A protein has these predicted regions:
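Short beta-strand/loop motif that positions the catalytic acidic residue
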Residues: 63-65, 70-76
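Conserved alpha/beta-hydrolase "acid-adjacent" motif
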Residues: 77-84
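Catalytic active-site module of serine/aspartate enzymes centered on a nucleophile-bearing elbow/loop
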Residues: 86, 92-138
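Helix-to-loop junction immediately C-terminal to a conserved catalytic motif
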Residues: 160-191
């Protein structure tokens, strides 16, 4: 019954280890008396009792309504944890599964496993009866941040992101000196293909400045239906751990009221899952959405641009191509039939917020570039921006600034001698792997 991965268990002190060894050694002679204490008839009776109890529990699992989180060890040598987890998921009304491929039977005793992080990632931590994605959130820990950075380490190494910001006087500098240090702030920008920019952006800003960006994300990332479709149910846990919340007016209001830095992509899924030839094209609603809410709290609006997706891959099959494939309509229905609907009252391409995969072909990696534009203050302009026309004018100005940021980066990256990973590898070979690699002059 002690089957487990002892290599991953938390080490004990020498004294405790010796005491455990002495106790175990002392118990060995007592094992010979087990046959007298537990005769065959007793064992048979206990097995029958266990089967009866198991049948009783299984017959009532469907009535359990409480939130249930099932942890399934992939390396469990004692019980078929993965199979049992799938069975429970089909019987319990409010169940979510988290698979741990490399963990053993005693997963809770293993050093690398963090139960609190797992609960946070599943969205099961709450402070009250009702789930509140804003107030329920627990700040990311140093270990969680390190794991998030490690998860994107390959992408960050391959793209070596360059971050620029704009000072209040309009001067563009390398680094994040142009970002305000206090909220509320709304970061509004372009959503790269498949959200490639999210990891380097959120973790890079947090590690460099201590500013924790809270993203407004598609509700699909928080739904159980998405977990049942994806190969890994925990694929989106990191977004929750890093502070993402479903994009709703209420959540936006709460984040601004608590003076957070809020990351907003008006183009949403249509922008992140764009078609061939649509890179760096904005798909924003025609009418302003965030301006009046931002002005209500005196939030600073910072437009930003991000480029580099076309330097790491090309779109091979987009949504239009997938719809022509045999049987894809089955997957399309599973992805979107029960998914939360966004932009239903919008016009134009932005209303097409269907979720779907994108098939890409990789390229020799180039480089990611970010530039945060000049901060736009709304403090003291609440009455002015209540006027729809003035709010719309500011909205279009923000959109224009985002487009200008993108064009600026597309032009300036041509001047970067280290845009290619090959040139960066040669530079690091000569100057050391920890050396910051130069880029163009802002």
């Amino acid at each position: 019954m002690l089957s487990g991965n002892f290599m991953k268990m938390r080490p004990t002190s020498d004294g405790a280890g010796q005491a455990l060894s002495d106790i175990t050694t002392g118990l060995l002679p007592s094992l010979t008396y087990l046959a007298d204490i537990l005769p065959k008839e007793s064992i048979v009776w206990k097995m029958k009792m266990l089967r009866t109890a198991s049948s009783f529990v299984n017959s009532r699992l469907h009535a359990v309504k409480a939130q249930t989180l099932v942890l399934a060890s992939g390396n469990d040598e004692l019980l078929p944890s993965r199979e049992e987890a799938e069975r429970l998921d089909g019987m319990l009304q409010n169940c979510r599964i988290r698979h741990f491929r490399d963990n053993g039977h005693k997963i809770l005793l293993e050093d690398e496993f963090d139960l609190a992080t797992t609960i946070k990632g599943a969205g099961y931590y709450r402070r009250s009866r009702q789930t509140d994605f804003v107030s329920d959130y627990l700040p990311v820990t140093p270990d969680e941040l390190e794991k998030a950075i490690n998860r994107d380490r390959v992408l960050s190494f391959a793209t070596d992101p360059v971050m620029l910001s704009t000072l209040p006087d309009g001067k563009i500098v390398r680094g994040l000196a142009g970002l305000p240090r206090e909220g509320p702030v709304v970061l509004v920008g372009y959503h790269m293909l498949m959200g490639f920019e999210l990891g380097p952006l959120v973790t890079g800003v947090l590690k460099s400045t201590g500013i924790h960006i809270r993203g407004l994300a598609h509700p699909f990332l928080f739904s159980k239906s998405s977990e049942q479709i994806l190969p890994d149910p925990s694929a989106h846990d990191l977004h929750r751990i890093m502070g993402a919340v479903p994009v709703t007016p209420v959540n936006f209001y709460k984040l601004l009221s608590e003076k957070h830095f809020v990351l907003l992509y008006p183009g949403g899924a249509r922008e992140a899952l764009h078609r061939k030839g649509e890179e760096y094209k904005l798909f924003w609603p025609e009418q302003s959405e965030f301006v009046r809410m931002a002005s209500r709290f005196g939030a600073t609006i910072i437009p930003f641009g991000a480029v580099g997706e076309d330097d790491i891959c090309d779109v091979l099959l987009d949504y239009n191509d997938l719809l022509k494939l045999p049987f894809y309509d089955i997957l399309d229905k599973r992805l979107n039939e029960d998914a939360p609907k966004l932009r239903t009252d919008s016009t134009g391409e932005v209303k097409n917020q269907d979720m779907h995969p994108v098939v890409v072909t990789p390229k020799v990696p180039g480089r990611f570039y970010f530039v945060f534009g000049k901060p736009i203050e709304t403090r003291g302009r609440e009455k002015e921006l209540r006027d729809k026309e003035k709010a719309q004018h500011l909205y279009l100005h923000v959109k224009s600034e985002v487009e200008s940021c993108i064009e600026y980066l597309k032009e300036k990256r041509e001047e970067d001698p280290y845009r290619s990973i090959l040139h960066r590898l040669l530079y690091q070979a000569a100057h050391g792997s920890d050396t910051e690699i130069p880029t163009f002059e802002p």
